[in-house]
Design a protein with these regions (language model features):
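Active-site catalytic loop in hydrolytic enzyme cores
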Residues: 1-64, 83-84
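C-terminal functional modules
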Residues: 165-174
Length: 174
């Protein structure tokens, strides 16, 4: 099933490019920003397109509700987006998979764990296009989220303040 939506926020360079082509960004503009919470094969995820990820309030819409956040970016400022995705993995307490063009790099898969092991994959970029894969242990993430404590063997960090356990239980039921 394909699900389409108008982008909620366009980067300044995108708006500039559209204007040079005599186009307008996101017309017609929705009265309310929209994001999709998708449940597929018992995995809950949402997608953010590039500059949308920079809105902290909009990222917080899915706190406690996601297993994975997918971020599709096209931006040369990879450090800026790396910091945002690291924050999202910790604040939303979910995996974050970010894709960027191979020319810029910065594509990564992060998990909400200590910094030294939070990058499951990180691609710096270059001329060779490639596909890398990793396994995300959704079950282990949810089990760690359910427990109110962590032991020394846990790689998943403590839940952030305000984590909604009811939302976790609801997510696990479906």
């Amino acid at each position: 099933m394909l699900v389409f939506r108008v982008k909620n926020y366009y980067a300044p360079k995108e708006i500039e490019l559209l204007h040079t082509l005599r186009l307008r960004a996101g017309a017609p503009k929705p009265k309310k920003q929209r994001y999709h919470l998708i449940r597929w094969k018992n995995v809950s995820f949402a997608t953010y397109n590039c500059f949308e990820l920079a809105n902290i309030e909009h990222r917080a819409l899915f706190k406690s509700k996601l297993d994975i956040l997918f971020a599709c970016v096209w931006n040369r400022d990879v450090n800026y987006y790396q910091h945002i995705t690291e924050s999202a993995a910790r604040d939303l307490h979910c995996y974050v998979a970010q894709s960027n063009t191979s020319h810029y790099g910065g594509s990564c898969v992060l998990q909400p764990s200590r910094s030294s092991i939070s990058n499951k994959i990180y691609v710096k970029g270059g001329e060779n296009h490639c596909i890398l894969t990793t396994t995300l242990d959704i079950k282990a993430l949810r089990e760690a989220q359910y427990r109110s404590f962590r032991d020394n063997n846990d790689i998943i960090k403590h839940n952030p303040p305000g984590f909604d356990y009811d939302a976790l239980l609801e997510r696990a039921k479906k």
